[in-house]
Structures are given as structure tokens and as C-alpha cells.
Amino acid sequence: MDATAIILAAGEGTRMRSNHCKVSHKILGKPMVQWIVDATIKAGCSRVVVVIGSHADEMRALIDGAYANSATKVECVEQTERLGTGHAVKVALEACGITQGPVVVLNGDLPLITADTVAKFAQTVATGELACTVMTMTPPDPFGYGRIKLGADGQIERIIEQKDCTPEQAATLLECNAGCYAFDGAQLAAHINEIGNDNAQSEYYLPDMLEILKGHGQAVSIFHCDDYRDGLGVNSRIQLAQLTAIARDRINEHWMAEGVTFIDPTQAWIGPDAVIGRDTVVWPQTHLIGHVTVGEECQLGPNSRLTDTTVGSGCTIDETIAIEAVIENGVDCGPRAYLRPGTHMLDGSKAGTHVEIKKSTIGEGSKVPHLSYIGDTTMGSGVNVGAGSITCNYDGVHKHKTVIGKDAFIGSDTMMVAPAQIGDGALVAAGSVITEPVPADALGLGRARQVNIEGWAADYRRRLHENDEV
């Protein structure tokens, strides 16, 4: 679809009481503005223009960082003077040279709008019969929204703001303005300069385009959302939480319909870019943030948070934090495991209780069951790491690597001082400090020999008591 989406994201958002741009606040781990950009891309818009103003550098980072490699052109245009929504659209048109085709103008704080809604909305002006359509909705509580009054011909007669509604209008006019507009690009470009600023705020308001277009004999109509939630916006932290709950419910219901079990759908927070395989069970307080893929027949949670992580099938992820990790099939993580960026758990491996792994590959069937830190390590298959063992990978300036061969056994409370090399089938005695390579099938022993002194403890206690009597 050769349509342009203009997303208005220049506002201050003062009611959020934040040091950050309103539309940068996250819903299920994703900034609001990215929800809307994604919806326009999925709807088939060929170009997306985000109008920024307040916190411009922050907004550029959010957009450029996420869409630098997008097949759809996504760009930021700065509105240096915030002179209203009409002015913002004019800035976008002039900067991008938009003169034709459907132009969809969306507020940047509508994270629930769907691609299907955007596509249908843009299509209303694609034939040229309508110069503009206004997105409307019928929320359960219309208080605070501008009300739509239609004429006998089905066109918009006027939009009556809440403060201007009579009691009768408030009771009978239940269709509300969602604040989004679709324009015939040629008509918009031809008449955008006719918007005036003769109002209390001396701003240029985009809704004034309705009367301007009608004055030129152009048809203006409405597009009613099938789901009123598509038109809900965020102006406060309370509304942010409310829309987060709606987004959570939508996503969880989708995955339940796809064959995923949720023990308590109100206590699982699945991001919009996550994918979950069938017959996986999601336990309470599970968070999937960013691009997360989970295979089939997994147990996720409770109390787990996965960010930009891939999980295979048949895995157990129990009270685990994983960030930018790859977890293959049949892997057991937790409880209370921490997989940091660069972790790669191969098939059948294990990261157990209070285990931290960073930038390491854990080989097929290898186990790190208890109280260990493994960093900058390549571990072969069939390795067992005893409780309390760590790789000492940092010398105060540089990180160094550890290599543990297949079928090696690392005894409990072992410190492997990197760069360290443990050969295939080697055994490292418990309590060792390993500073030299251990050859294949060798025993590595790096501790002092135990010495027993007969009677020493009894003599020690006797001397303590004598000192107490002095």
C-alpha cells in the first residue's frame, strides 16, 4: 500500500511527570512509539514519518536504533517550534515532500492500535472519493473525549469537545474522536497552509482541516474502530498501567488460542515481539521482553525474565534471568540462574541454582548445577562443574578465556585462573586453584596437602579457658 504514516510524537507529556518523552515509556518492554511504528509497517505503509520535538535526541535513538535496517523507510522530522498538530503535519509534509497518496496521521501515544485498523483506515481515502476520514470509537465511558455529530448525509457535522457538550449531547452522542485522521495526500498538501492560529493558544490545529476541506466541496467522513481500545491513548502513569494490562490480555489470549497454557494470564507479561511454541506452560511472573522465541513443551517460570533470548523445545526455565542468550533443546535453568549476554547453552545442558554464566558456551549435556560463575568460557560436552567453582576471567585490566574439554570433571570449590585450559576427560580436585594447563585425562591438583595434628584442638580449647581465668 503506497501510504504514508505520520506519527505525532513531539509533545511534552507533562502529565506523565517524567524526565523522558511520553511516547518513550514502555508497554511490555517496548516503547509506545515503536508499537505504533510497527503497526503502520505491518499495515503496509511504504513510508513512516515520526514528528519529534521534546527530547529529540532520545527519540532519534529510539527510532533510528530500532529501524535502521527496516525495509520500510522510517524517519524522524523535528518540529523545532511546537505550534500545534496542524503545524506538526505541515513540517512533516514539507520535510518529506509528501504530495499524494493516502496519509494517515496518528498520535504517538496510541500503543494499542493494530495493523488491521491502520490498513482499513488508510484504505478509506485511497480511492479519492473522500478527502479525509476521522477515526472514531465508542468507549464504555466517553467522558473527556470529543463527541462526533454526523449530518444527514453521514458526513461529520462537527466535533464537540467534552467541555462544550450540553447534557443532552453528552448523553446521546456516544461516538468519540480518537484523534487520528486519514487524508487524501493531494488534498492535504493543497490546503494545509489554510489552517489558522486564531485561538487562545495561537496554535495550528489539525482538526480545522475538516472545515477547510468541506469548504472546498470535499467529502469528509468517519472510520469507526471495531475495537474501541485501538483508540485509547496514554496521558498519565495510570493510563500507562491500564493500557499495559489491556496489551497483556490481548497477547496472552492470542497465545492461549495458539496452544500455550498460562497458569494465571494476569501474572504473565509477554512482549509483542515474543513467539511461544505450543504446549509450553507459562507460570506466574514470567516476563518475555524484546525478541524472544520459545519452543514447544517448555516450562517458563515462575519468576523468570527473558530478554532477546532464544529458547528451544523441552526446556525448564525456573526463576531465571536470561539476556541475549541462546538456550537449545532440553536445557534446565534455575532456580535462580542468571544467563548474561553471549551465553549459549547447548542441548541437554544445565545451569542450576545460583549459577551465573556470561559470554560462554556450555556443551551438550554439560552441567553447572550449583553456586558457580562461568565467564568467557568454552566448555565441551559431558562436563560436570562442582558447586562453588568459578572461572577467574578478569585480571583487573583484561578478560581472559577458559577452555574446558569434553567429559572433564571439575571438583567443588575450584578456581580456574584464566587463561585456563582443562583437557578432555581431565579431573580437577576439589578446592584447587588452577593456574596451569591440565592435560587430557590428567588429575589437576592445586591445593596444599591436608595435615592432621593430633590433640591440637583439645590443647587449643584448654589454652582458651586458661586465658579466661586470668
Q: Where are these predicted regions, by residue range?
A:
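Catalytic-core segments of class I nucleotidyltransferases/pyrophosphorylases
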Residues: E157-D249, E253
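Conserved N-terminal catalytic core of the sugar/cofactor nucleotidyltransferase
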Residues: T4, P31-Q123, T127, H465-E466
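Short beta-strand/turn micro-motifs composed of small residues
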Residues: A9, I52, N107, T136-M137
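Short catalytic helix/loop segments, enriched in acidic residues and glycine
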Residues: N19-I36
